[in-house]
Amino acid sequence: MANDQNKDYDKIIVLDYGSQYNQLITRRIREFGIYSELKPHTITAAEVKKIAPKGIIFSGGPNSVYDEGALGVDEDLFKLGIPILGVCYGMQLMAQRLGGDVEPADNREYGKADIEVTDDSAKLFRDLPKDQTVWMSHGDLVTRVPEGFRRTATSINCPISAMDDDDRKFYGIQFHAEVQNTQYGHEILHHFAFDICKAEANWSMDDFITKQIDKIRAEVGDKRVLLGLSGGVDSSVVGVLLHKAIGTQLTSIFVDHGLLRKGEADQVMESLKGKFGLNIIKVNAKDRFLGDLKGVTDPEKKRKIIGRDFIEVFNEEAAKLNGIDFLAQGTLYTDVVESGTDTAQTIKSHHNVGGLPEDLKFKLIEPLNKLFKDEVRELGEKLGMPHALVWRQPFPGPGLGIRVIGEVTEDKLEIVRDSDYILREEIAKHGLDKDIWQYFTVLPGFRSVGVMGDGRTYDYTIGIRAITSIDGMTADFARINWDVLQEISSRIVNEVKNVNRVVYDITSKPPATIEWE
C-alpha cells in the first residue's frame, strides 16, 4: 500500500541496511497490529517527516560501518524526536554517528549467545529476566557508547550488547530481536513499539481490503486487467480481490503449462470459476513450455524461460482480447526480498519479479506485494474463499519446473506429481497438514542402485522437503514421526515408477532456501 493508503494507521518504518532478516522486523511489528514497511536507508529526514511514523528501526546488515561505501543515514533523522531502535549494524551505525566507538570484534559472534541485562530500568528489557539467550550475527562491536547513552546489556564476547539514551529515545541492540532464536525478542520489540513509540494497534486486514479495493478502482478506472493464475494461493487470492474490486473488468488466464501438481488444473477451474464467477480463459501451453525447457539444466535459466513464456502467452491472449492495459500478479513481500533489494544480496530470481521482460506491454498491479504469506491466507479467508483453497500448499511460480533438478521432461514430471500426491495424502491422513508450513517432493536427478524383488534396480531418488515456518523468511525442517516417514517412503517406492530410494531434507533456512532450485 502506498503512503496515502496508510494515513490513518500508526506506522513504524524499518530502514534497509541489507540484512536478509530485515523483512522479519516488519512482520513482527505487523503482528502487533501496527503497520510497518521497509524503506531504503537513503530516505531523508524530510521524507520521514511526511510519513510521520511513530518509530524508526535501523535493520542489521552484512557490512562494517568503516567499509568503503558503508551504508549511512541522514543524520537529521536524529533531530526529528522520533524513537529509533538500531539492530546489529543499525546499533553500530547509531553509535558511530552519535560519537561512540565501533571496532572489529576479537571474537565474532554468529549464533546463540547469552546476555545479561545490566540496568533494571532499561525500557526495552522491562519485566524480563536478567539472563537471556539471543541470536548474534556480527563482526564489529560498539566499544564506547555515545555521550548520553548507557550500557543496558552485556555478553562475554560483546561487552556492550545493548545501549540506550532514554531522554532522546534512542536504543540499540547488538542481537537480532526479530528472529525466533532470541528468547525474548517478541517482548523487546513489543516494548519498543508500545511503551516507547506509543503506537496504537490500528492496522487490520479488514482495513487493508477496504483501502486496497479503493486503490485498485482508482488506478484501473474503467480499463481492463489481465491476471495470470498459477494454481497457487497467491494468484487465486489476487483474482478474488480484483474481482471484488472491478468485477467483469478482470479477465484471468490460467496457463496449464504442464508443470502443475496432480489434479490442480481442474481444482482451480472448479473453485474460482464455479464458486466466484471469475472469467477464466484456460490455455493449454504444455508443449510450448516443455519444448523451450528441453536441454536446459541451469535453474536460473529455467526460471527465466518459464517467466518469459508466461508473459508471451499473456501478450498473445491479450492481443486476442483487445483493450487490456494492466497485468496483475501475486507477488508477495517475501518474493521481493529474496530477489534482492538495492542493499540485499540476490538469493534467486523469483518468477513474479525476475522473469519480466524490459518491453513489458502492461502496467503491473501487485496488490499483495506488501503482504507476507500468512497475511495472504488471512486475506483469502476474509474474502470468503474456501478453506481448502486458502490453505493449500505454497507453490512457486515456475511450478514443478524447479522441483525437477536439471532438465525437465514429462517422465520426470510424472514422478514428482505422483510422489508429491502421496506425500500430501499421508500428511493429511496423519493430521499434520496444519502443523507443517510447507511440504513437497523433489527429483534430484541422480540414480542409485537398489534391489526390488529378486532384481537389481538403478532408479531415481526422491527428496522430501517439509518445513515449519511463520512467514517463509526463516524455516526449520519438520520433525515428522519416523513411522510416518517410513510409510510415505514405502508408498513412494512401491507406487511410483522408476523410484527406489527416498531421502528427507533436514536443512534449515538459512543456509538453504525452501525450494531446491
Swiss-Prot record:
Keyword Nucleotide-binding attributed: yes
Annotated PROSITE patterns: GATASE_TYPE_1 (PS51273), GMPS_ATP_PPASE (PS51553)
Enzyme Commission number(s): 6.3.5.2
Pathway: Purine metabolism; GMP biosynthesis; GMP from XMP (L-Gln route): step 1/1
Binding site for ATP: 230-236
GO cellular component, one term: cytosol
Span of domain Glutamine amidotransferase type-1: 11-202
Coiled-coil segments on the chain, per record: none
Superkingdom: Bacteria
Top enzyme category: ligase
GMPS ATP-PPase domain sequence ranges: 203-392
Active site: 88, 176, 178
Keywords assigned by UniProt, alphabetized: ATP-binding, Glutamine amidotransferase, GMP biosynthesis, Ligase, Nucleotide-binding, Purine biosynthesis
SUPFAM superfamilies in alphabetical order: Adenine nucleotide alpha hydrolases-like, Class I glutamine amidotransferase-like
Catalytic function, reaction form: XMP + L-glutamine + ATP + H2O = GMP + L-glutamate + AMP + diphosphate + 2 H(+)
HAMAP family: GMP_synthase
PANTHER family in the record: GMP SYNTHASE [GLUTAMINE-HYDROLYZING], GMP SYNTHASE-RELATED
Subunit structure: Homodimer.
Main function: Catalyzes the synthesis of GMP from XMP.
Protein name (database record): GMP synthase [glutamine-hydrolyzing]
